[in-house]
């Protein structure tokens, strides 16, 4: 359970970063990150 909560908090932080930085390298790295999560 703890791992799931930490993951949700991490994703929430990533979403906040996306809202602050629209486009650019952040968006590319986030797309790669989500593709990585889908493979698991």
UniProtKB/Swiss-Prot annotation:
Subcellular localization, as worded in the UniProt entry: Secreted
Q: Which UniProt keywords apply?
A: Competence, Pheromone, Secreted
User: What domain of life does the native source organism fall in?
Assistant: Bacteria
- The question of whether Secreted is a record keyword is answered with yes
- Chain residues in the propeptide: 1-24
Of the GO CC terms on this record, one is: extracellular region
Enumerate the InterPro entries for this protein. Answer: Competence_ComC (IPR004288)
**GO annotation terms (biological process):** establishment of competence for transformation
An example Pfam family from this entry, by short name, is ComC
Gene Ontology terms for molecular function:
pheromone activity
Q: Does Secreted count among this protein's keywords? A: yes
- What is the protein's known function? Acts as a pheromone, induces cells to develop competence for genetic transformation.
Q: Which NCBIfam families match?
A: ComC_Streptocco (NF033214)
Family, as annotated = Belongs to the ComC family.
Q: What is this protein called?
A: Competence-stimulating peptide
């Amino acid at each position: 359970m703890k791992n799931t909560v930490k993951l949700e908090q991490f994703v929430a932080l990533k979403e906040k970063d996306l809202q602050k930085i629209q486009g650019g390298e952040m968006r590319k790295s986030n797309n790669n990150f989500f593709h990585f999560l889908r493979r698991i």
